[in-house]
Amino acid sequence: MSPDPKYSAYLLDIEGTLCPLSFVKDTLYPFFVLHVQRIVYENFNEEHPKDEFIAEQLAKYDIKEEGQAGKNKLVEHLLDLVANDTKDSTLKALQGHVWEVGYNSGELEVPLYPDVIDFLVRNDGRGDDKVPVYIYSSGSIHAQKLLFGHVKNSGNSHAKIAGNWDLNRFIDGYFDINTAGKKTESNSYKKILDEIKMTDKPHDVLFLSDNAKELDAAKECGISVGLAMRAGNVTVPNAIDYKQYFQFTKL
C-alpha cells in the first residue's frame, strides 16, 4: 500500500480500530456487569448513597417500583442495556465510573495495538507537520481518557518506563455521543467538523472505523474514510467498497 496523502486531521474509532474488539466485549463489559448489582444496591434510592455521582446517574432511569423491587428492576434493565450494546449515554457514564476503579487497581490494562502506539509516537515527532488526532467513541469522554491513560506496556520499542502508559498527551480531542451524537448519524460528523474547524475541507479529515454504517455517515459529510481490518472484527460484506487499513504504518 502506498503512503496516504497528507491529511489535516485524523478521527479515530477505538474498539476494533485502536484496540481489539474482544477487550471491550470480553473484559470491559464483564467488569461492569460484575459491579452492577453492588452499585445499584448501594446508591439507588438511598438517603445516603456511597457514591453521589452514581446515585445521580441511576436516578435518571424511570423505575416505578420501590424498595428492593425497584433495585432489582434497575439491575435487570442495566444488564439488558449491556447485553444489547445499547448506546445509552447514562450507561456509558456509569461504565466509565466503574472502569476507573478497575484501571486504578491495576485490574484493567488496555492492549492498544502496537502499530497504533508507533503511529501516535511517530506523528507526535513530526513537529510542525504533526497531524491532530481526535477520538470518537460511543464510550464517554471520561472512559476514553481512562483507556488512553492505562495502556499496557507490552515491550514496545517506545517504552521508557515500567508499568502502564498514559498516551493522552498524543490526543488532541475527544468526542462521544453526548458531545457529538450517535456515530451512525451524519449530523454527528458535521458537529465534529465544526468543532475542529474543518467544515470547509472535510476531505482533509480521515475517519477510521471498523463499522461500515459509521463510515457511511461520515462520508455523507464529505469526510475521507477507511475501514479498520483487525483480527476478530465483525466481517463487513461490502469491505471492498472502502479503503482498508490493516495497520497504521502508512499514516
UniProtKB/Swiss-Prot annotation:
According to UniProt, the name of this protein is: Enolase-phosphatase E1
Q: Which reaction does it catalyse?
A: 5-methylsulfanyl-2,3-dioxopentyl phosphate + H2O = 1,2-dihydroxy-5-(methylsulfanyl)pent-1-en-3-one + phosphate
- Supply the InterPro entries for this chain: Enolase-ppase_E1, ENOPH1_eukaryotes, HAD-like_sf, HAD_sf
The UniProt record gives the binding positions of substrate as S137, S138, K183
Which GO MF terms does the UniProt record name? Answer: acireductone synthase activity; magnesium ion binding
- What the protein does? Bifunctional enzyme that catalyzes the enolization of 2,3-diketo-5-methylthiopentyl-1-phosphate (DK-MTP-1-P) into the intermediate 2-hydroxy-3-keto-5-methylthiopentenyl-1-phosphate (HK-MTPenyl-1-P), which is then dephosphorylated to form the acireductone 1,2-dihydroxy-3-keto-5-methylthiopentene (DHK-MTPene).
One cellular component GO annotation, for this chain's record?
Answer: nucleus
Compartments reported by the entry: Cytoplasm; Nucleus
Q: In which pathway does it act?
A: Amino-acid biosynthesis; L-methionine biosynthesis via salvage pathway; L-methionine from S-methyl-5-thio-alpha-D-ribose 1-phosphate: step 3/6; Amino-acid biosynthesis; L-methionine biosynthesis via salvage pathway; L-methionine from S-methyl-5-thio-alpha-D-ribose 1-phosphate: step 4/6
Q: Which residues are Mg(2+)-binding?
A: D13, E15, D210
State if Cytoplasm is listed as a keyword. yes
Q: Which domain of life is it from?
A: Eukaryota
Q: Which coarse location class describes where this protein primarily resides?
A: cytoplasm
The entry describes its oligomerization and partners as: Monomer.
Organism field: Candida glabrata (strain ATCC 2001 / BCRC 20586 / JCM 3761 / NBRC 0622 / NRRL Y-65 / CBS 138)
What NCBIfam families does the database record attribute to this sequence? enolase-ppase
Could you state one GO biological process linked to this protein?
A: L-methionine salvage from methylthioadenosine
Q: Which family does it belong to?
A: Belongs to the HAD-like hydrolase superfamily. MasA/MtnC family.
What keywords were assigned to this record? Amino-acid biosynthesis, Cytoplasm, Hydrolase, Magnesium, Metal-binding, Methionine biosynthesis, Nucleus
**EC number per UniProt:** 3.1.3.77
User: What are the names of the required cofactors?
Assistant: Mg(2+)
How does the cofactor bind to this protein, according to its record? Binds 1 Mg(2+) ion per subunit.
Pfam families from the UniProt entry: Hydrolase
The enzyme's first-digit EC class, named in words, is hydrolase
Gene (name only): UTR4
